[in-house]
Amino acid sequence: MCIRDRYLKQKNEHPTVVIHFDTRFLSQEFSQEIARVLATEGVSVVLADTYKSTPELSFAVRELKATAGVMITASHNPSHYNGIKIYGADGGQLLPEASEDLSQYINAIESPLEIEARDFNSLKTEKLITSLPTEVTEAYKQGVKDLVGVIEENNARVVLTSLHGTSLPIAADILTELGFDNYV
């Protein structure tokens, strides 16, 4: 029984999963491998073409009305670590019960090297793997801009400390679009 049947089809007959990745070593390649496995199982995958922040994944899952989301990250852990975080259709991390069920399924896999995964480019050609629409990123940016009007009104100085993380490009775009030239 595959992940689609065990977990995703319980949530939606035609499941869609959004996958994002951060700036860590091999995160993009890891995201593509997960996309290959899910798409091979018949899951529609929406894959970011470039690194994204975790809040962007949560937003994209809700915006696209996806069944689930996968974030390739090790969060605050050392840079040589990597891992995945799974999100539900509400854009939040899985609740303990759902997380435990998925963990049991994964732990029951006898030989991970025998998991079937078709060619990435073929799956893209067949549109089983699609790119994250730019409209989703633009909607996210607009949502953030709508929330930060108070900062703009008070001409506050902004200090951005993404520490080489994924939020730097989008945060800089948002601040520039809001007319901030007084940020570090």
Describe each model-derived feature in a short phrase.
Residues 9, 24, 62, 107, ...:
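Residue-level marker of positions within ordered structural domains that often coincide
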Residues 12-90:
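Ferredoxin-reductase
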Residues 9, 39, 176:
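Gly/Ala-rich phosphate-binding loop of Rossmann-like dinucleotide-binding domains
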Residues 6, 55, 59, 138-142, ...:
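Short, contiguous clusters of charged residues that form electrostatic/catalytic patches at enzyme active sites
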Residues 6-7, 37, 105-109:
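Generic non-transmembrane alpha-helical segments
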Residues 1-5:
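Conserved small/polar residues in nucleotide/adenosyl-binding loops
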Residues 8-14, 150-155:
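Short, flexible coil/linker segments at domain boundaries that flank nucleotide/cofactor-interacting
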Residues 82-184:
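Gly/Ser/Thr-enriched, mixed-charge loops and adjacent short helices
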